[in-house]
């Protein structure tokens, strides 16, 4: 057990030489303390200590600042008396399981208790000055705040097991609540009354009565949640269930999707003729009545309504279909015995359709459920390898063979649909809304059924106001209606934000009319004079809106006075000029899940100003960067789920590559945001007549400086020469300085040094002063680091030794013992803020440097590391450090955490992923 008096005997007293408070003086200095004029301890900093228990008695009553962060063995902190002057309490990253804050902490402003494994936190009295509380990443089951927390603004409680959190209505200054990844089932409605609230994180909870579209769609869900909570604050509120979802029929043309839709609605309905094929999309409601309590978990029987979205299977409409797919849907993939390439030239395999459904996550982060339906069973069967399908697509929940002409056989399908409802979403039967909100939805449905295709936002507001919705509720409900597909709203589009579409079929029909229109040229030029012919039953104002809608969907782009529609380009590839008869290199982007139909067409729209000499066709385009006179050919191989890129640049820098990659990533992000689709692609390079993954190419570039793909890793930029500088005084310096040292000037050993240097320099931009020496000799280490705050060393290493260059014209290098390195650093007569040793097995050296008092922090490695691991760590670490240059420990932890989440992170020789928190180790000065 330790007490304050015992601790200060071994610590350094910080002296106040000016108008700086004791708290500010000690803050940031470990193993130190400060006294007031009466000789009482006012500030104490002993982070990363070996304390097990700390008891604070009367000798601590003057404490204003207490820092014990990172004391991993500290299990107990006992306050024997109130600490009325304490303002800051840092107890994060310790081993405290429970803690009690007694009465009398009236000055306490900030409390940090994250990452302790804390199971109980008790405030026995008021904390009227408390502004911030961080209890993230613990094991707390509940939090309760009474009227003594009126100043509290920021609560961080992510990653606990919170089942309940209660607030007092007097807490009117709340601004930020981070409550993600808990087990909350409800939230106090009165929060909507707090005018200062701005941020609310709720992802990963269990608020099953509130639609996840409200609280789990955005990282900060306050805007929509505020409106919902406002609706609950009203007197005599009636909550009603919204038992509704989409059923989306997908598959190739002529497999019987429309027949299935008709038979679900009426088992006796006649089958449609071939001429009645669905043009793009049809939508009809399908209600299942009298679902039992056993099926729903509700106290009484209820009905459930599917809106059946019947997608036409014709290839030309696939680009439209994705506009209307969504999560919280049940997918029916329909095939048949004659659904093969032999019968249908536009046939695509089940992999495309199931990958499309698989890309849409449902509310729990799981993939949307799919029923695999083989139709026309009376006419023949096609063998299905169910095990293979399930292995590729785990969201296929059931397989069924039916015939639409055999009533008895068909009835098995609706029974299977009922069983699948609960798989759509965990809250599918529990979500409730204010009856006023659902009343608005009913009003909109009635308008649609009466033939109204759209209304103005002003009309929508009037309908909501008449139903009693407030301004916050109106904003939230419109967002939700758009997300669940009840309306289409382009709130971010200046020309469409006052327009709300009630009938998606009307939009679909308008787009289909463009697709079906016979243009007079191969470029599919949509001239203004064509619009009255294409949309003859639409008014002029409607045509203007629809044209803007096509632009918003990246369906067309403007060229002079006309609009170009890439989806309608000819299949014929144009002839290239002589200077494009060959290209320098080829890259493939392989989409991990699937390549959405129309991706290349949207890509052309976004980069249309770079299209070269009208070299554009249905499956490809040639781009030019005018400033550098460089070229890129981009083509789509849809069935391979791949985009192919060929580049041409005499200088080998290929500036178009970054723009192409960035644009395709932006298109992915748009779908991730609007549709919650999980889209990513892997990069491959064609090297020595083989396709190689990008990480493998990066290693090859390290070995071969002439590799044509070095531009992908920033290796084509000129190297900034190291300039020896005189020692720079630290006081008053605006920026921290970094010196990058390596010992491989001829790049003879693949340690990733040049890439590290380039990545670090690009990452930090002008946030730090950056210097480098790429041929550091063993006896120049000290002189190179004079006046530098951060020293980054990238060399080869073995335990207790690093290797620095001896002669840059040979392979010779000198082994430098840890003790010698320490002596070199001692010459600077300066304690560094940080030394980073990116070398194999460098932890021993890092520890010796810290133990020698030469730096406050040092980072080393525990094993042999690959160049990829070294590069990734360096880039991520400095990217985070530039925003928090004084929080080195936290930045290190966050770096390791984020890298461990990367599914493309480096692998060990045995194929296992790196655990960066074990491979890299940080040491901190403690004496």
Curated annotation (Swiss-Prot):
LRR repeats: 38-61, 83-107, 109-125, 127-151, 171-194, 195-217
Protein's name in the database: Roc-COR-CHAT protease
Residue positions of the active site: 796, 840
EC number from the UniProt entry: 3.4.21.-
Pfam families: COR-A, COR-B, Roc
COR domain residues: 436-623
GO biological process, one term: defense response to virus
Xref: InterPro entries: COR-A (IPR032171), LRR_dom_sf (IPR032675), P-loop_NTPase (IPR027417), WH-like_DNA-bd_sf (IPR036388)
pH dependence: Optimum pH is 8.4 to 10.2.
Keywords: Antiviral defense, Hydrolase, Leucine-rich repeat, Protease, Repeat, Serine protease
Task of the protein: A dedicated protease for gasdermin bGSDM; cleaves the bGSDM precursor, releasing the pore-forming moiety, which integrates into the membrane and triggers cell death. Probably involved in defense against bacteriophages. Expression of bGSDM and this neighboring protease is highly toxic in E.coli. Cells expressing the gene pair stop dividing and lose membrane integrity. Both proteins are required to kill E.coli.
Annotated coiled-coil segments of the chain: none
Gene3D superfamilies: 3.30.310.200, P-loop containing nucleotide triphosphate hydrolases, Ribonuclease Inhibitor, Winged helix-like DNA-binding domain superfamily/Winged helix DNA-binding domain
Region (LRR 5): 152-170
Molecular-function GO terms, alphabetical: serine-type peptidase activity
Organism: Runella zeae (strain ATCC BAA-293 / DSM 19591 / LMG 21438 / NS12)
The organism's place on the tree of life at top rank: Bacteria
């Amino acid at each position: 057990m330790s007490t304050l008096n015992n601790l200060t005997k071994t610590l350094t007293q910080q002296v106040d030489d000016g108008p700086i408070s004791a708290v500010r003086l000690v803050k940031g200095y470990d193993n130190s303390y400060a006294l007031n004029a009466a000789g009482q301890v006012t500030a104490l900093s002993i982070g990363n200590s070996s304390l097990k228990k700390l008891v604070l008695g009367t000798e601590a009553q003057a404490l204003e600042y207490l820092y014990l962060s990172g004391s991993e063995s500290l299990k107990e902190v006992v306050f024997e008396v109130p600490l009325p002057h304490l303002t800051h309490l840092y107890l994060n990253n310790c081993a405290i399981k429970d803690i009690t804050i007694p009465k009398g902490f009236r000055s306490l402003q900030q409390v940090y208790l994250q990452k302790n494994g804390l199971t109980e936190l008790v405030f026995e009295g008021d904390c009227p000055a408390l502004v911030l509380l961080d209890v993230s990443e613990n094991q707390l089951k509940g939090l309760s705040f009474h009227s003594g927390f009126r100043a509290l603004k920021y609560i961080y409680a992510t990653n606990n097991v919170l089942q309940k959190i209660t607030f007092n209505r007097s807490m009117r200054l709340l601004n930020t609540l981070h409550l993600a990844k808990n087990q909350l089932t409800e939230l106090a409605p009165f929060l909507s009354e707090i005018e200062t609230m701005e941020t609310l994180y709720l992802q990963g909870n269990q608020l099953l009565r509130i639609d996840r579209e409200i609280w789990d769609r955005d990282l900060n869900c306050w805007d929509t949640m505020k409106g919902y909570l406002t609706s609950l604050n009203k007197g005599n509120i009636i909550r009603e269930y919204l038992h509704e979802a989409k059923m989306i029929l997908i598959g190739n043309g002529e497999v019987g999707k429309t027949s299935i839709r008709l038979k679900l609605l009426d088992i006796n309905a006649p089958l449609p003729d071939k001429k009645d094929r669905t043009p793009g999309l049809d939508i009809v409601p399908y209600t299942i009545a009298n679902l039992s309590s056993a099926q729903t978990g509700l106290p009484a029987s209820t009905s459930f309504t599917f809106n059946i979205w019947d997608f036409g299977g014709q290839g030309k409409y696939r680009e439209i279909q994705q506009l209307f797919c969504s999560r919280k849907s049940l997918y029916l993939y329909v095939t048949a015995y004659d659904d093969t390439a032999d019968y249908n030239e536009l046939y695509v395999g089940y992999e495309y359709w199931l990958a499309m459904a698989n890309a849409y996550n449902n509310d729990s982060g799981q993939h949307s459920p799919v029923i695999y339906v083989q139709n026309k069973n009376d006419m023949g069967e096609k063998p299905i390898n169910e095990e293979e399908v399930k292995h590729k697509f785990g969201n296929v929940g059931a397989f069924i063979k039916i015939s639409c002409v055999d009533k008895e056989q068909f009835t098995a399908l609706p029974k299977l649909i009922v069983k699948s409802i609960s798989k759509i979403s965990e809250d599918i039967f529990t979500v409730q809304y204010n009856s006023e909100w659902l009343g608005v939805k009913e009003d909109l449905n009635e308008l649609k059924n009466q033939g109204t295709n759209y209304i103005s936002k002003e009309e929508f507001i009037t309908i909501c106001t008449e139903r009693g919705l407030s301004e916050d509720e109106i904003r939230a409900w419109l967002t939700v209606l758009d997300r669940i597909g009840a309306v289409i709203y382009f709130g971010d589009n200046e020309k469409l934000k006052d327009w709300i579409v009630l009938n998606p079929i009307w939009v679909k029909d308008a787009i289909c009319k463009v697709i079906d229109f016979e243009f007079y040229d191969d470029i599919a030029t949509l001239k203004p004079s064509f619009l009255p012919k294409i949309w003859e039953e639409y008014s002029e104002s409607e045509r203007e809106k629809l044209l803007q809608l096509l632009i918003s969907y990246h369906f067309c782009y403007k060229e002079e006075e006309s609009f170009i529609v890439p989806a309608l380009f000819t299949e014929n590839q144009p002839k290239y000029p002589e200077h494009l008869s060959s290209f320098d290199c080829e890259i493939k982007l392989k989409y991990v899940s699937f390549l959405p139909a129309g991706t290349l067409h949207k890509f052309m729209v976004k980069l249309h100003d770079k299209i070269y000499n009208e070299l554009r066709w249905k499956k490809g385009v040639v781009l030019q960067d005018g400033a550098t006179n460089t070229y890129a050919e981009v083509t789509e191989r849809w069935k391979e789920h791949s985009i192919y890129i060929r580049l041409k640049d005499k200088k080998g820098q290929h500036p178009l590559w970054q723009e192409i990659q960035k644009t395709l990533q932006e298109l992915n992000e748009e779908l991730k945001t609007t549709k919650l689709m999980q889209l990513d692609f892997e990069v491959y390079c064609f090297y020595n007549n083989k396709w190689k993954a990008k990480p493998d190419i990066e290693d090859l570039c390290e070995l071969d400086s002439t590799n044509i793909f070095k531009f992908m890793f920033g290796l084509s930029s000129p190297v900034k020469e190291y300039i020896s500088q005189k020692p720079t005084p630290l006081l008053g310096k605006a920026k921290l300085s970094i010196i990058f040292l390596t010992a491989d000037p001829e790049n003879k050993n693949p340690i990733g040094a040049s890439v590290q240097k380039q990545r670090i320099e690009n990452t930090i931009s002008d946030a730090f002063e950056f210097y480098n020496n790429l041929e550091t000799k063993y006896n120049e280490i000290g002189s190179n680091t004079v006046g530098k705050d951060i020293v980054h060393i990238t060399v080869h290493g073995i335990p207790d030794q690093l290797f620095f260059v001896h002669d840059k014209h040979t392979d010779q290098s000198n082994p430098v013992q840890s003790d010698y390195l320490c002596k070199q650093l001692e010459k600077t007569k300066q304690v560094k803020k940080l030394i980073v040793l990116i070398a194999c097995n460098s932890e021993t050296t890092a520890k010796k440097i810290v133990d020698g008092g030469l730096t406050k922090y040092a980072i080393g490695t525990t094993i042999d590391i690959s160049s990829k691991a070294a590069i990734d760590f360096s880039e991520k670490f400095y990217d985070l450090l530039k925003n928090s240059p004084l929080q080195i420990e936290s930045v290190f932890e966050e770096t390791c955490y984020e890298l461990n989440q990367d599914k493309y992170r480096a692998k060990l020789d045995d194929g296992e992923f790196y655990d960066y928190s074990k491979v890299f180790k940080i040491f901190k000065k403690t004496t």
